Swiss-Prot record:
It comes from the Eukaryota. The gene is Anxa8. PROSITE patterns: ANNEXIN_1, ANNEXIN_2. Ca(2+) binds at M266, G268, G270, D310. This is Annexin A8. One of its GO terms (molecular function) is calcium-dependent phospholipid binding. The keyword Acetylation does not apply.
Amino acid sequence: MAWWKAWVEQEGVSVKGSSHFNPDPDAETLYKAMKGIGTNEQAIIDVLTKRSNVQRQQIAKSFKAQFGKDLTETLKSELSGKFERLIVALMYPPYSYEAKELHDAMKGLGTKEGVIIEILASRTKNQLREIMKAYEEDYGSTLEEDIQGDTSGYLERILVCLLQGSRDDVSGFVDPGLVLQDAQALHEAGEKIMGTDEMKFITILCTRSATHLMRVFEEYEKIANKCIEDSIKSETHGSLEEAMLTVVKCTRNVHSYFAERLYYAMKGAGTRDGTLIRNIVSRSEIDLNLIKGQFKKMYGKTLSSMIMADTSGYYKTALLNLVGTDL
């Protein structure tokens, strides 16, 4: 299923929240779990991983009203490491969390281009608008300004272009003439010439609807005798290549894209915990169940089995709760 439909797939939600919800006893449970010496991590997991984000925000309000403390700050003071990072991520409203991930990717020395590419290429126009709004409210500068200040060249161009969210046309109408024109233009901008006309690639990939692009990719393959992915790999490199390939992957099947992100976050030595946490938290109330299905199809194992083998302790328990049972 293509990326633009993922936001409306109710069956994809792995964290549905509590049907008999009352924030006051939940807040009290959390207070007791962190009161005095020691922390009852399991109690924290049982509450926060089994509530929706809206419910968590209500728990935080109740916690403040009952005990005069900020819940997120209290959690930060009681927890540590990857487990703290995961639990704190759950406490952010969704758009503020995405804004934070983008801000963290750009602050300090170096830029985590992969995080920026992942978020901007896989979100819809409405989602991007809300993320930009949250970013400006939380950090006092616009996301576009910060991206322009932190990146350069064609990578900056494609990221700013993605921010405009022009790929959201879900009308289903596709102009066959324009499809052929775009496929030929991509061929002429890459395979047919010495060098590459990067702006032509950027313009078509970032401003056409997903339904249109799917047809363009088909026509391109007929003209070039190779898939668009192979042409991008041979014509570009580095972060620009990653950005273009991500747009193509998300256009073809967003669930496959996120399955791949999760798989490579755990494959091999070490774990890319930032990628693992961000994608499980941000997709848990959208389409994580659908991602799990693609994961099993693509890699022959379940997402939860890989998490069990690659993580440990309360961090593992919390992740598995968010992922839910494998289908």
